[in-house]
């Protein structure tokens, strides 16, 4: 086994250790069926003809057919180099290029061209920037909202899947002020193995960021990836901790190893357990839950947002539903 990564750099000791375990064979239930409806076909042709780029097609997301049929798509901002390394993530770690201040405008134009109902914006951690990339994330939301303000079907809704910005108050305030319809920050795994899987993040800090977003009035969301060494009991505890922190929406998925350099798959969670976890999360009190082997954090994102809003409005005092909807 070569100790050189595909990008030519020397592999980290952790990556060398990971590479000693061959890529695991997927169970038969890890498969998708291509269902190409008319809206998907339109989107596919548009993306190709306009030279647009979305995470959906570039990452080979298994849910692209359903999401594009609903006119939903995900965009990656901030470049292709992350300043942090998570042991499950396929994005490379390294020194990012200089901030592209025109990127938010271009993303907004892509959203307009694709006539999206719902856009998820995710990106890399930018600890190299003085503001941690807060302006970039916020400005992308502002551009999408501004450029789609006159859309016949209504302004495109934006979900911001963001890093933790080290929980810096000024950086969080910048991001929150852009008022994305949903603020998502993924904890991804349970406390016991968190530091090993996500050494650049802190579990309690992530919970704090979710709480801050909820206190600001934003709809909040997170994700748990299963199969990296957690126990069933730890998943239940993490769900309770997320809900207590103010998380309203949750997605639960199976870890799929990007390459031999990444953390080995420790278990394949069977479909019935995902069903059980969905029921458990709903009993805990989450407004919306998506749970399944091929669910991703942006899967059916627009539907989850709508579930959160319906619950907020039904829980609002009489005459207060309008206030609840304006809060996001």
UniProtKB/Swiss-Prot annotation:
Domain of life: Bacteria
Chain ranges passing through the membrane: none
Family assignment from sequence similarity: Belongs to the radical SAM superfamily. Lipoyl synthase family.
Residues annotated to bind [4Fe-4S] cluster 1: 56, 61, 67, 298
The Radical SAM core domain, residue ranges: 68-287
Reactions it catalyzes: [[Fe-S] cluster scaffold protein carrying a second [4Fe-4S](2+) cluster] + N(6)-octanoyl-L-lysyl-[protein] + 2 oxidized [2Fe-2S]-[ferredoxin] + 2 S-adenosyl-L-methionine + 4 H(+) = [[Fe-S] cluster scaffold protein] + N(6)-[(R)-dihydrolipoyl]-L-lysyl-[protein] + 4 Fe(3+) + 2 hydrogen sulfide + 2 5'-deoxyadenosine + 2 L-methionine + 2 reduced [2Fe-2S]-[ferredoxin]
HAMAP family in the record: Lipoyl_synth
The protein's name: Lipoyl synthase
Lineage: Bacteria, Bacillati, Actinomycetota, Actinomycetes, Kitasatosporales
CDD domains noted in UniProt: Radical_SAM
SMART domains: Elp3 (SM00729)
Pathway: Protein modification; protein lipoylation via endogenous pathway; protein N(6)-(lipoyl)lysine from octanoyl-[acyl-carrier-protein]: step 2/2
SUPFAM superfamilies: Radical SAM enzymes
Gene source species: Streptomyces avermitilis (strain ATCC 31267 / DSM 46492 / JCM 5070 / NBRC 14893 / NCIMB 12804 / NRRL 8165 / MA-4680)
Localization, UniProt: Cytoplasm
Cofactor names: [4Fe-4S] cluster
């Amino acid at each position: 086994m070569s100790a050189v990564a595909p990008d030519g750099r020397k592999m980290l000791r952790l990556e060398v250790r990971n590479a000693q375990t061959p890529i695991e064979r997927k169970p038969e239930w890890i498969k998708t069926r291509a269902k190409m409806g008319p809206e998907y076909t339109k989107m596919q042709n548009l993306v190709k003809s306009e030279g647009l780029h979305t995470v959906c097609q570039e990452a080979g997301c298994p849910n692209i057919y359903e999401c594009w049929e609903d006119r939903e798509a995900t965009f990656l901002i901030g470049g292709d180099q992350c300043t942090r390394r998570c042991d499950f993530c396929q994005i490379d770690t390294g020194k990012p290029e200089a901030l592209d201040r025109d990127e938010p405008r271009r993303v907004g134009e892509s959203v307009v061209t694709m006539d999206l109902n719902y856009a998820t914006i995710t990106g890399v951690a930018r600890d190299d920037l003085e503001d941690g990339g807060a302006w970039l994330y916020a400005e992308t939301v502002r551009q999408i909202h501004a450029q789609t303000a006159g859309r016949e079907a209504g302004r495109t809704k934006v979900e911001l899947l963001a890093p933790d910005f080290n929980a810096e108050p000024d950086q969080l305030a910048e991001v929150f002020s852009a008022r994305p319809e949903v603020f998502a920050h993924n904890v991804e795994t349970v406390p016991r193995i968190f530091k090993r899987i996500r050494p650049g993040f802190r579990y309690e800090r992530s919970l704090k960021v979710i709480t801050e977003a909820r206190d600001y009035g934003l709809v909040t969301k997170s994700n748990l990836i299963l199969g990296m060494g957690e126990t069933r009991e730890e998943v239940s505890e993490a769900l309770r901790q997320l809900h207590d922190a103010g998380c309203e929406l949750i997605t639960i998925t199976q870890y799929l190893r990007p390459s031999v350099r990444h953390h080995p798959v420790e278990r394949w969670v069977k479909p019935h357990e995902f069903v059980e976890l969905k029921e458990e999360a709903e009993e805990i009190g989450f407004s919306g839950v998506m749970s399944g082997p091929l669910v991703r954090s942006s899967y059916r994102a627009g539907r989850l947002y709508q579930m959160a809003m319906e619950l907020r409005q039904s829980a609002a005092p009489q005459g207060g539903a309008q206030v609840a909807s304006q809060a996001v």
